[in-house]
Amino acid sequence: VAKCTEESGGKYFVFCCYKPTRICYMNEQKCESTCIGK
C-alpha cells in the first residue's frame, strides 16, 4: 500500500494513500477501511 506524509503542527505523520486519487486520510481507522491492496 502506498503511503504519504502530511505536515501538521510542524510534525510529519504517515497516512494511507487511497489509490488512484492518493488522498491522505488523517483518521487511521478510515485508512484501514479504505486502502486498496492492503
From Swiss-Prot:
Coiled-coil blocks: none
Modification comment: Disulfide bonds.
Keyword Mitochondrion applies: no
Keyword terms: Antibiotic, Antimicrobial, Disulfide bond, Fungicide
Tissues where the protein occurs: Expressed in flowers but not in leaves, seeds or roots (at protein level).
Gene Ontology biological process terms, A to Z: defense response to fungus; defense response to Gram-negative bacterium; defense response to Gram-positive bacterium; killing of cells of another organism
Role summary: Antimicrobial peptide. Active against fungal species B.cinerea (IC(50)=5.8 uM) and A.niger (IC(50)=5.6 uM) but not against F.oxysporum, F.graminearum, B.sorokinina and P.debaryanum at concentrations below 10 uM. Active against bacterial species P.syringae, B.subtilis and X.campestris.
Name of the molecule in the record: Antimicrobial peptide 1
Organism: Taraxacum officinale
Lineage, uppermost ranks: Eukaryota, Viridiplantae, Streptophyta, Embryophyta, Tracheophyta
